Amino acid sequence: LADYEHTRALLLVGSHPRHDAPLLGNRIRRAWKHGAEIHAVNPLAFDHHFSLNNQLIGDPAQQIADLAAVAAALAQLRSVTFSAEINEWAARSTQQTQAQAIARSLHQQEPSRVLFGDHAVRHPSASLLRRIARFIAEASGSAFDEMPHGANGAAAWRVGCVPQRGPGGSATAIGSNALDAVRKSRRAYVLYGAEAPEDFADGAAAAAALGQADFVLAFAAFAHPTLETSANVILPIGLAPEVDGSYVNVDGTLQAIAAGAKMPGDARAGWRVLRALGAALGLGGFEFDDFATLHANVRPLLGGGTLDATAEQPSPVPIAGGEGLLVQRYLPIYRVDGVVRRAPALQSTVLGESGELRLHPEDALALGIGQAGDVAVGGVRFACVASPEVPRGVCRVASGFASTAALPVTGARIQIERVKNG
């Protein structure tokens, strides 16, 4: 993290450090104050607290093309070859001049870095974007960094809480990801601190899958309408500030936390509930009675293996053609989990949102709503505002709201109609 202060050139790929990782954002701002050249390939024109030398924003397909154009420019500078697939994407970019400027900056400035951010991880073709970003880093001699997805994402990868790897990077049979698990309905689900539809990429599919399941077990800290109608058993657990625990930060450093509040009612620390359930089922690995023993058992798993993802399989490119606006999902900073969603003080700030749709001003004008108005998508009414952060041809849809859950995921197209009042 400290190395960012000394960076001379930085490419942000799907990253808004000011919101995604404020401490990292502060380091980048310091580097900018000392003359660092900062560039971005992003889905939206984010409100950064530093200036950008070059900014390429576009719909999900354009993001791939623009990043590929940077890769193509670097390949030409370094006289190296790269895949025909990336070359084909590069030819689709309409921002060739800026892409070449970014390539020259990364090539000439030392040290340089490529930061693969949270919005890139959420892209429908994240693995393709990652492959291109890694090529850019390798061709330019830049460091490559990827932001962990979620507050404890790095620890989850280390201990194997992902479908494609075991503890410490050990090989394992590839299981279903969360999207497949809800789109291809299962007979039973176990939810741990997750709320549907708000916490899922395809919230509508998640809520429907839970409603159709034969059995749903939920570990939850809050009452929720979906759980009340779909869960067969709800086990109350404490929130993170109410229990002892630990996190692994972006530098891989283990950070322990102590409980700072008392759990209400019958709630118990989640690890205690899991231990009791594991013991009742006769499973191995649950022979611990306190957090210190649990922590000692898990800690060795955090230091082994590698998080290298260069061998990953490319994902398809599910970006819809046809008419209508392309959806760009966006998770507002105060909609990321059940705690902040239930905090009135946070929701009343300037960063609090109400689930309105956002369009580029020219698209809003063409629709006839001016700066703000009501629109309909599939017969459902939404507030809509014009915003210069949104690229042309894109509809920014806020995630984390039950009201927007029925709208499609990033890369799909929607038809929007103006609602005439009165």
Residue locations for each model-derived region?
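Iron-sulfur-cluster electron-transfer modules
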Residues: L1-G25, R29, Q55-D59, A65, ...
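Long, well-ordered, tryptophan-enriched scaffold segments
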Residues: Y4, W32-G117
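A cross-kingdom feature strongest in bacterial/archaeal respiratory oxidoreductases
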Residues: H6-L12, R18-D47, L115, R130, ...
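Conserved active-site and cofactor/substrate-binding residues in soluble primary-metabolism enzymes
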Residues: L23, A61-A65, T94-T97, A101, ...
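Short alpha-helices
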Residues: P43, F50-S83, A126-L129, F135, ...
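Acidic/glycine-enriched edge-of-secondary-structure segments
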Residues: A72-Q96, A151-A173, K262
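A glycine-rich, hydrophobic/aromatic-adjacent loop/helix-cap motif
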Residues: H107-A181, Q328
